[in-house]
């Protein structure tokens, strides 16, 4: 279980529930598949999948949860085709115009008819609570998926106050300075990919498999373009992309880290999961600290709001 994307949130209050208590709170919201007329459903599943039954997996102050979502696949083009056919039938058979309001009613009826026959797709979003650092780390590339998990967590727990982890210095400013000044924080190396944006006209230039210190890249920065995505390597152990929202994407754990999990022989899938989780969380905890420091520390919360 190696996270590939990170969206990180600060808990504004300590998380007081034990893993056992959290399991009991999540259990009533266990995932159930979509019924015939449900467009989508979400609920909690064991992080260990079929190898576990608990809705949490905890180790060393880190508590992992897994939120599963299922939705019916009902392409808008299919609904539109059925609607146009129905409207044409009414116009021909009854020799009258179909109003906008009636079209909306017909559309709802068509969706109601098609839903039971629709295929489904599902995804599982993993996250863990770092009780020591008061963080929620979500394995999600999109903010929407992370927000869905947090909304479900609030529904189960009752209250889960948190805010995005924002650094003091704006990420585009820091990332641009790395290339402009040809310097980067200790423990970090530049990768070979970045995305530059022109604030005035929105023009975007994407650089891949390229030396980011090259004159060609610097010339774009000298014209006023800023970096809103950049590839870095943390302590030769993790490759990642940092974006302008301080979200981390396309994480790749190098062998130097993965070998730590493989060095202790696991006798079961559950033990292997536990070892990987323990190592991953320790490494990510330190990486997050280093990256926050590289961007000037954590933004101070406004306690007046």
UniProtKB/Swiss-Prot annotation:
The molecular function GO annotations come to: double-stranded DNA binding
For biological process, the GO terms are:
DNA recombination; regulation of DNA recombination
Whether Isomerase counts among this entry's keywords is no
User: Cellular location of this protein?
Assistant: Cytoplasm, Nucleoid
The protein, known as: Recombination-associated protein RdgC
Mind telling me which NCBIfam families this protein's record contains?
Answer: PRK00321.1-3, PRK00321.1-5
Q: Which UniProt keywords apply?
A: Cytoplasm, DNA recombination
Q: Name one Pfam family in it.
A: RdgC
GO CC, alphabetical: bacterial nucleoid; cytoplasm
The keyword RNA-binding is annotated on this UniProt entry: no
Q: What does it do?
A: May be involved in recombination.
Q: In which family does this protein belong, per the annotation?
A: Belongs to the RdgC family.
Do you know which InterPro entries this protein is assigned to? RdgC
| Superkingdom of origin organism | Bacteria
> Source species, please?
Saccharophagus degradans (strain 2-40 / ATCC 43961 / DSM 17024)
């Amino acid at each position: 279980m190696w996270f590939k994307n990170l969206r990180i949130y600060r808990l504004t209050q300590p998380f007081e529930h034990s893993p056992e208590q959290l399991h009991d709170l999540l259990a009533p919201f266990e995932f159930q598949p979509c019924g015939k007329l449900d467009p989508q459903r979400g609920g909690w599943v064991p992080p260990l999948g079929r190898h576990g039954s608990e809705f949490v997996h905890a180790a060393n102050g880190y508590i992992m949860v897994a939120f599963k979502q299922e939705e019916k696949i009902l392409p808008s083009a299919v609904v539109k085709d059925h609607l146009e056919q129905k409207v044409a039938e009414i116009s021909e058979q009854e020799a009258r115009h179909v109003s906008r309001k009636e079209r909306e009613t017909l559309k709802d009826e068509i969706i109601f008819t098609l839903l039971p026959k629709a295929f489904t797709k599902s995804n599982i979003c993993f996250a863990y609570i770092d009780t020591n650092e008061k963080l929620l780390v979500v394995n999600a590339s999109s903010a929407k998926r992370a927000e869905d998990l947090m909304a479900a967590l609030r529904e189960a727990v009752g209250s889960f106050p948190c805010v995005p982890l924002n650094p003091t210095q704006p990420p585009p400013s820091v990332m641009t300075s790395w290339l402009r000044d040809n310097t980067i924080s200790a423990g970090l190396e530049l990768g070979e990919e970045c995305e530059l944006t022109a604030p005035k006209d929105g023009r975007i230039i994407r650089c891949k498999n390229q030396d980011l210190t090259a004159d060609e890249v610097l010339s774009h920065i000298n014209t006023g373009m800023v970096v809103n995505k950049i590839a870095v390597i943390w302590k030769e152990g993790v490759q990642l992309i940092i974006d302008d929202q301080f979200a981390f994407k396309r994480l790749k754990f190098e062998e130097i880290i993965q070998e730590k999990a493989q060095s202790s022989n696991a006798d079961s899938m559950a033990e292997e999961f536990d070892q990987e989780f323990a190592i991953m969380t320790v490494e990510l905890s330190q990486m997050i600290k280093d990256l926050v420091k590289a961007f000037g520390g954590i933004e101070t919360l406004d306690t007046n709001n």
